[in-house]
Amino acid sequence: MIVLILVFRLVIGEQMIDVLGPEKRRRRTTQEKIAIVQQSFEPGMTVSLVARQHGVAASQLFLWRKQYQEGSLTAVAAGEQVVPASELAAAMKQIKELQRLLGKKTMENELLKEAVEYGRAKKWIAHAPLIARGWGVSLVSRCLRVSRAQLHVILRRTDDWMDGRRSRHTDDTDVLLRIHHVIGELPTYGYRRVWALLRRQAELDGMPAINAKRVYRIMRQNALLLERKPAVPPSKRAHTGRVAVKESNQRWCSDGFEFCCDNGERLRVTFALDCCDREALHWAVTTGGFNSETVQDVMLGAVERRFGNDLPSSPVEWLTDNGSCYRANETRQFARMLGLEPKNTAVRSPESNGIAESFVKTIKRDYISIMPKPDGLTAAKNLAEAFEHYNEWHPHSALGYRSPREYLRHGACNGLSDNRCLEI
């Protein structure tokens, strides 16, 4: 038991009396504490005044007021800190929300477990079984990430409904025969160039053109597709320029290559291309080396091919690499006499003459690799047919998969520029 010595000073009239004696500590109930606190909120009352009236320390009464304002009546009775009612309500609300989310995710998890049994092929296959087993449409659409409106359409279809996209059964026999005919003559052609040749033949016959995707599907089903090309590592040297131009007779490019005949004889070919329509303007083949005279012959043949006996009205760029036959003074002087402006690529930059480099790869892959070349004379004759086939029939991706001369005729018949013809 705690014994307190209380000192009271009573003022009676003008005499002051000190009262000294033992006094027990008074324990107040919760109701008494609340009454004292409420009295401190009355008008004209202060914490200090009410505390003196009831013999309570002002700090203790201030603590009771704080606990009372926070709604912690239990704290007033127990004399210890508890969570305020506002925080308790927020915590209870959060607990209810977490319980709702937990139940929602549990249902979604159960739905997805059942959907795995049905939806290994396509998601729409799992719709009907799941909804038939009692799952809601909204829950199914949200879990499977499909359109809710489309689910409603599927559920309301009649029993005799048929998918019009799958009701057409086309006969691919004739198309397959034509594909075999094309790749029989040109085995290095992929489905895009096969489609281009079939499209051209259909235009000549006045028949509807075949879709490229259909050609791809037929060739894939019959194992006629070419092997995918291996990924080429990117070059460390960035090439930001553009070799191709939008109009013909603005820039020509030239390069050379060689190949070996079956008897060991080597032929060296020099050619010139237009950097817009990709037509092989002129070419020359020899068993000797690449020299200035051969390049001059190719220059003259290219000018005669495009301008006849006249010279170009404006200079045409003559783009080549840094070979000695192209940098010779005689070659450059002769080029300027013909109205050509010699341009050389940067050192060790084959990309700067990429059109000519690509042409070399095309000729070697699609023609030289499959044509008979027992000796130099036979190879030269077959090479002439290869250049003619390239100009007249070989589809080029940059020309909308049309051949160079087909591209030129298409633009001339429609009265369009080369740039607009390419868009068509």
From Swiss-Prot:
Q: What is this protein called?
A: Insertion element IS2A uncharacterized 48.2 kDa protein
Keyword annotations of the record = Transposable element
GO biological process entries: DNA integration; DNA transposition
Named from the GO MF annotations, one term is:
DNA binding
Output the InterPro entries linked to this UniProt entry: Homeodomain-like_sf (IPR009057), HTH-like_dom (IPR025948), Integrase_cat-core (IPR001584), RNaseH-like_sf (IPR012337), RNaseH_sf (IPR036397), Transpos_IS3 (IPR048020), Transposase_8 (IPR002514)
Q: Which PROSITE patterns match?
A: INTEGRASE
* Keyword check for Chaperone: no
Q: Which family does it belong to?
A: Belongs to the transposase 8 family.
List each copy of the Integrase catalytic domain by range.
229-412
Lineage of the organism: Bacteria, Pseudomonadati, Pseudomonadota, Gammaproteobacteria, Enterobacterales
Give the source's domain of life in one word.
Bacteria
